[in-house]
Amino acid sequence: MSINLNQIKQDLTQITNDVLTAANLRRGDIFVLGCSTSEVVGGHIGKASSREVGATIIETLLEILKPLDIQLAVQGCEHINRSLVMERSVAEAHDFEIVSVVPAMHAGGACSVAAFEQYSDPVEVEHTVAHAGLDIGDTAIGMHVKFVQVPVRPSLDTLGAAHVTALRSRPKYVGGPRATYDI
């Protein structure tokens, strides 16, 4: 499959803006990305990673999220236990467990590699509690999005050849028959 990087950027911008609108994030919130560039280019997850596509995806997300002061955490593959790349300042501010690994194309994936290259002081963390996230290629980001997770359906459900889903979170409803939830 031939990939048009400009189209990837355009579609990803639309998808991300849809998720941001639904998630109603605030400054400092964490947005997690799970992405298989193999799936984006029409391959099987983990079998056709694209450094070019990974770099384009991370660059595009940072262009959108940085001005909003929303922090991007990029999930790696199972070969690095789905650890995430984030800026050291974010990891330290949230007291996330920093782990010793540097992502590679086939141990972390192209987006993790791109994030590690594009961040100013990248680290890998074992786990995060994001407020929303984007899953490109069915990579399973749910373990990194805080409860209660709510599916978001962006206006586009594919990026390249990859299936796209998203999550936002909301506070848990607690109480009994007398409780109200609207303020």
UniProtKB/Swiss-Prot annotation:
UniProt-listed Gene3D superfamilies:
Hypothetical protein TT1679
| Top-level taxon | Bacteria
What is stated as this protein's family in its record? Answer: Belongs to the UPF0340 family.
Q: What is this protein called?
A: UPF0340 protein LCA_1354
Q: What lineage is this protein's organism placed in?
A: Bacteria, Bacillati, Bacillota, Bacilli, Lactobacillales
